[in-house]
């Protein structure tokens, strides 16, 4: 029983703390990778309003592909 408590005390967190992508403060486990619910909702709002976008080429023939070497 005593050994179980010692083993449980040595459990390491799954994720390393990172700075919040919005404000730079240390991240919070509950809101990972953000520091707070506010920063999490700011980021979600940006995604929902289209502030973040993944660039795509209108025509694949005009897309800038790296030269392939055979």
From Swiss-Prot:
<keyword id="KW-0479">Metal-binding</keyword>
<feature type="binding site">
    <location>
        <position position="39"/>
    </location>
    <ligand>
        <name>Zn(2+)</name>
    </ligand>
</feature>
<feature type="binding site">
    <location>
        <position position="35"/>
    </location>
    <ligand>
        <name>Zn(2+)</name>
    </ligand>
</feature>
<feature type="binding site">
    <location>
        <position position="20"/>
    </location>
    <ligand>
        <name>Zn(2+)</name>
    </ligand>
</feature>
<comment type="subunit">
    <text>Interacts with GyrB.</text>
</comment>
<keyword id="KW-0862">Zinc</keyword>
<protein>
    <recommendedName>
        <fullName>DNA gyrase inhibitor YacG</fullName>
    </recommendedName>
</protein>
<comment type="function">
    <text>Inhibits all the catalytic activities of DNA gyrase by preventing its interaction with DNA. Acts by binding directly to the C-terminal domain of GyrB, which probably disrupts DNA binding by the gyrase.</text>
</comment>
<dbReference type="GO" id="GO:0006355">
    <property type="term" value="P:regulation of DNA-templated transcription"/>
</dbReference>
<feature type="binding site">
    <location>
        <position position="23"/>
    </location>
    <ligand>
        <name>Zn(2+)</name>
    </ligand>
</feature>
<comment type="similarity">
    <text>Belongs to the DNA gyrase inhibitor YacG family.</text>
</comment>
<dbReference type="Pfam" id="PF03884">
    <property type="entry name" value="YacG"/>
</dbReference>
<dbReference type="GO" id="GO:0008270">
    <property type="term" value="F:zinc ion binding"/>
</dbReference>
<dbReference type="InterPro" id="IPR013088">
    <property type="entry name" value="Znf_NHR/GATA"/>
</dbReference>
<dbReference type="GO" id="GO:0008657">
    <property type="term" value="F:DNA topoisomerase type II (double strand cut, ATP-hydrolyzing) inhibitor activity"/>
</dbReference>
<dbReference type="InterPro" id="IPR005584">
    <property type="entry name" value="DNA_gyrase_inhibitor_YacG"/>
</dbReference>
């Amino acid at each position: 029983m005593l050994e179980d408590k010692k083993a449980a005390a040595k459990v390491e967190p799954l994720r390393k703390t990172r700075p919040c992508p919005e404000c730079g403060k240390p991240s919070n486990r509950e809101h990972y990778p953000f520091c707070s619910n506010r920063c999490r909702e700011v980021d979600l709002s940006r995604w929902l309003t289209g502030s973040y976008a993944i660039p795509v080429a209108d025509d694949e023939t005009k897309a800038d592909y790296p030269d392939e070497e055979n």
